């Protein structure tokens, strides 16, 4: 089959640019060469993403993040010591996206018209190396909204999706490895997002906050990068009950490629993808599991999270660059997935969702 057009619903591109100091305009080999000998991050020299590799893989549209965590005095996680600092970080990330737009490397997809224009551009026969990567702007964790009113400011500059939580306790909602119901600020955040017509990303919400959010939120919901608890029994993944509830809400779930979410008993810094037999077949297992629960292929897609503070040391052994996302489709074809189902998983489900829920 031809290379399907891919939408990847979770890439921390600005984090890579500004915290990892990676110039994504450079070839991937050069990005990794400049990190030889560096030890400040666990994934130095193991990057999988550059603009060139996105184009090679026919990944023409992504959901790209802002991220800035606030941590209180008793929170051991890395993060900023005030929401104002976290907000400033996200604004620096926005400035990088704007700089990439001015360079012609990226284009923001704010509304339905921009979406259709961009999809038409990637359908034409011009070589992909001349085409900008489209991005829908999302935020991973809402800590950086100094007040709930800041979400309105963010919507005005193009933010279209919000994940209220990340790891640990958050100002608006508690996330992975944490517990607790949505607080008053979190509920107010959801009401504001609802009024603006924003997309709620339920990825990383702890179980109690997940169910609170589904009850409270009336607008569009997706899970940009989340796998199945049936395979890795950890609160970071969704139980079958959660997946079924999302299917009922018309959500799409993006399957992620962080190895610890793919195989049980992964030990960070010790386990290896080959040693744990973590390959793209595991991604196919997660895709198939959601399809079995849904009875169709309409609610699952790709949200790789590649280079999300991990690289080739902690992703499928048969993926060296993001262009290797294309390897999932022959695996699905071999398992009996139709071309229509494969195209839905590659991008069709995200396209349908965005056509329905982006503003006019």
Q: Where does each model-flagged region fall?
A:
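N-terminal hydrophobic targeting/anchoring segments and the immediately downstream early-domain regions
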Residues: 1-179, 184, 233-360
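Histidine-centered catalytic micro-motifs
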Residues: 6-13, 205, 223-226
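Short, catalytically relevant binding-site loops at active-site mouths
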Residues: 207-208, 228-230, 259-262
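Short acidic (Asp/Glu) and glycine-rich catalytic loops that position anionic groups and cofactors
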Residues: 222, 227, 306-309
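Loop-centered beta-sheet repeat module
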Residues: 179-215, 220-225
